[in-house]
């Protein structure tokens, strides 16, 4: 399922990142790597605040829709 469908407070794992090479590289540099455990902290003004490797990262809904996740 896309990250945009994950519930706030849920812990999930990154499964696949879709998009162009530069998009995938950008998200990987933020810590979104296959198998990484992440959690949705909150949604503010259409952006998702995600906990990735003990760091909070804000991503747009458009960018989050490219990140496929699976349940923890």
Question: Model regions: which residues?
Answer:
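Hydrophobic beta-sheet segments that form the core/acyl-binding groove
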Residues: 38
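Charged, well-structured alpha/beta interaction segments
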Residues: 29-30, 42
């Amino acid at each position: 399922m896309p990250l945009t469908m994950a519930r706030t407070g849920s812990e999930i794992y990154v499964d696949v990142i879709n998009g162009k090479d530069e998009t995938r590289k950008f998200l990987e540099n933020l810590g979104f790597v296959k198998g990484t455990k992440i959690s949705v902290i909150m949604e503010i003004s259409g952006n998702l605040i995600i906990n990735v490797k003990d760091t909070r990262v804000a991503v747009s809904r458009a960018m989050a829709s490219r990140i496929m996740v699976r349940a923890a």
